[in-house]
Amino acid sequence: MGIQHKLDVFIVSENIAIKDANLLNGDSYGCTIKLKLNTKKSVRFVVLLEPEWIDEIKPMYMKLNGVSVDLKLDYKDAIKRIYSVDLVLYSDSVIHLFSDTDERYTCEYPTIKVNMIKKYYHVQHRGTTCVHIESPINVSDKYWFMKRDGWYVDRTHS
């Protein structure tokens, strides 16, 4: 079998969960999200990475229309990393989330299209993943990024 990290991306403001966006094998993870909009929009992304091992984990990076964006590492423990970012978008945009820049891996990342005008979304390119989209975001998934008293809810023993 091989190494596999689990990657979920939540577009909180649109109530969309992009699940299992990780490659089927290997320690490279990421996806491309194409957003269609016709007006200024505030968008919150939460990225949940569940590594298979804890020795060394590649950091997650984000680009918005080719420009680097700082992802905030909100939470880190042995079984998960939670990143977040709030963006203000003015027009159609492309988000790249990635751990690698090597094209051998990035060409296998999935591509998801989200039409914020028509509230429509679909997987344009699956890559070598089992990516799927859920909307609305499952209540149990929301616990991954809900805070209670300033701390993320610990679901390790749920």
UniProtKB/Swiss-Prot annotation:
Species this protein is from: Rabbit fibroma virus (strain Kasza) (RFV)
Physiological role: Plays a role for multiplication of the virus in different cell types.
Disulfide bonds listed in the record: none
Protein family (similarity comment): Belongs to the poxviridae C7 protein family.
Origin: domain of life: Viruses
Protein name as catalogued: Probable host range protein 2-1
Any one of the GO BP annotations: viral process
